Structure formats: C-alpha cells, structure tokens
Amino acid sequence: MSFDNNYHGGQGYAKGGLGCSYGCGLSGYGYACYCPWCYERSWFSGCF
C-alpha cells in the first residue's frame, strides 16, 4: 500500500494536490479518490 500511496502522491501533487494522495492512500479505491481532479491520474497510477 505504501508504494501505491507514494506513486500516486507524486501524480496527485502535480494534478490536484494533497487531497489526491490522501484520499487514494486512505480509502484505496483508486479511481474513487476524494480528489476529483486526479480522477484519470488515480486510475492510471493503479493505487488500489
């Protein structure tokens, strides 16, 4: 989970911000992140 969180964190910062990495890391639903700005980013990041 740590790898996914970090990987998506980099993408999230560039696209949406903290909300991206936080939502993806905590919930772990990938495309269903709390941050709507990184919707496509989260999907391609594969942070399930």
UniProtKB/Swiss-Prot annotation:
One Pfam family in the UniProt entry? KRTAP
As given in the record, the signal peptide range reads none
Tell me a GO cellular component. Answer: cytosol
Known InterPro entries for this protein? KRTAP_matrix (IPR052878), KRTAP_type8/19/20/21/22 (IPR021743)
Q: What UniProt keywords are attached to this protein's entry? A: Keratin, Repeat
Quaternary arrangement and interactors, per the entry?
Interacts with hair keratins.
Functionally, this protein is described as follows: In the hair cortex, hair keratin intermediate filaments are embedded in an interfilamentous matrix, consisting of hair keratin-associated proteins (KRTAP), which are essential for the formation of a rigid and resistant hair shaft through their extensive disulfide bond cross-linking with abundant cysteine residues of hair keratins. The matrix proteins include the high-sulfur and high-glycine-tyrosine keratins.
Task: State the name under which the record lists this protein.
Answer: Keratin-associated protein 22-1
